[in-house]
Amino acid sequence: MANVVVVGAQWGDEGKGKIVDWLSERADVIARFQGGHNAGHTLVIDGKVYKLSLLPSGIVRPGKLSVIGNGVVLDPWHLVGEIAKLRGEGVEITPDNLMIAENAVLILPLHGELDRARESHNAVAKIGTTGRGIGPAYEDKVGRRAIRVADLADEATLALRVDRLMVHHDALRRGLGIEPIDREALLAQLREIAPQVLPYAKPVWKVMNEMRKAGKRILFEGAQGALLDIDFGTYPFVTSSNVIAGQAATGTGIGPGAIGFVLGIVKAYTTRVGEGPFPAELKDADGERLGERGREFGTVTGRKRRCGWFDAVLVRQTCATSGVSGIALTKLDVLDGFETLKICVGYDLDGERLDHLPIAADQQARCTPIYEELEGWSESTAGARSWADLPGAAVKYVRRIEELIQCPVALLSTSPERDDTILVTDPFED
């Protein structure tokens, strides 16, 4: 029985929420394996809209186990708030259907303060962070000074962890002109939140492996997109974690052999939030039209997304680094009505044609797109549920994308509604 990893194959915001919800109906376990509460996802179920940023998408479905793995950095106050919000919307959340890795790292208020202070001091070279403390929390994890979920259970250990953290952070805060950490206030905050978090804490690696051996279907839910990966993204304009599919194993404690199918989520055009290179970006009327029709505003930040034509070079690259088995192509309906469509098929860098995005940031910034033009269509694709419902030009567009990215389409999404999906390959089938 195949276990499935879902990853964004662009810069995030590809429409993962709908696809994950569609798959989660048949999964037994839905696990998040990286990131924090910086990347939101929107679910539309029976006309009701749910906006999540930390909890796995499966939490809104009864009878599913939702898991927050050790690869996630966890803001405990945001967690408690998101749980309360969903409970207010009629969603049942208990330790029976939500599990948090004991070794997941906590995001503390000091992480957000540091994140925002750095961004304000770097006026010339902003990264485009959400300011929620994700990056600083990962820094503490790698620096071996982080506070983890399990530390909340022992007050003596917690105090030692806070003292170790303060040595590092107070030095940083002095340099940035921030007041020193109030040790007692931080400890009081952690003592207060601990009993609201600890009931969900479990040895996730152990439970996940038991589930696998029992033949349960596991869905690994990625956040953000592979082009924001700390190693393979447009560094330094990236997130602070690995986003590619291999992180699903590391971020939950299950072996890579457990992964059967990697589904890359790909928008039929390209968007990006925040700073960083974007070779196929459109700063004209076509770009505005894509943004308006696609409602391209961030779920968490509300920031307007930059829009551009489909970049086959980048998606081919992310399909390779994540070992994508098939893609889910979303938002095809946004392209309805364009007379001519363009696909980026290569880059020009100082007169040389490239078939990949170079790793150096200065070279990325100098890349200009090489386009191939395709005929558009005037008919509507919204709500199509079979290939026969699509205009011929739309089918040609999809087929050309498959050829250029060297990866087949497994699913085609034609609206935010979960049933408006054309299934080609079921990722859960053996």
UniProtKB/Swiss-Prot annotation:
PANTHER family found in the cross-reference section: ADENYLOSUCCINATE SYNTHETASE
Pathway assignment: Purine metabolism; AMP biosynthesis via de novo pathway; AMP from IMP: step 1/2
GO molecular function: adenylosuccinate synthase activity; GTP binding; magnesium ion binding
Pfam families from the UniProt entry: Adenylsucc_synt
Subunit structure as annotated in this protein's UniProt entry: Homodimer.
Gene (name only): purA
InterPro entries per the UniProt record, alphabetical: Adenylosuccin_syn_GTP-bd, Adenylosuccin_syn_Lys_AS, Adenylosuccinate_synth_dom1, Adenylosuccinate_synth_dom2, Adenylosuccinate_synth_dom3, Adenylosuccinate_synthetase, P-loop_NTPase
PROSITE patterns (alphabetical): ADENYLOSUCCIN_SYN_1, ADENYLOSUCCIN_SYN_2
Binding-site residues for substrate, renumbered to this chain: T299, V300, T301, G302, R303, K304, R305
Co-factor binding comment: Binds 1 Mg(2+) ion per subunit.
Keywords: Cytoplasm, GTP-binding, Ligase, Magnesium, Metal-binding, Nucleotide-binding, Purine biosynthesis
Co-factor requirement: Mg(2+)
Catalytic reaction(s) noted: IMP + L-aspartate + GTP = N(6)-(1,2-dicarboxyethyl)-AMP + GDP + phosphate + 2 H(+)
Family: Belongs to the adenylosuccinate synthetase family.
Reported function: Plays an important role in the de novo pathway of purine nucleotide biosynthesis. Catalyzes the first committed step in the biosynthesis of AMP from IMP.
Residues reported to bind IMP: D13, E14, G15, K16, N38, A39, G40, H41, T130, R144, Q224, T239, R303
CDD domains the record matches: AdSS (cd03108)
Active-site residues, record numbering mapped to chain: D13 (proton acceptor), H41 (proton donor)
Localization per record: Cytoplasm
Keyword Endoplasmic reticulum: no
GO biological process entries: 'de novo' AMP biosynthetic process; IMP metabolic process
EC number: 6.3.4.4
Annotated Gene Ontology cellular component terms: cytoplasm
Protein known as: Adenylosuccinate synthetase
Keyword Nucleotide-binding attributed: yes
Residues annotated to bind Mg(2+): D13, G40
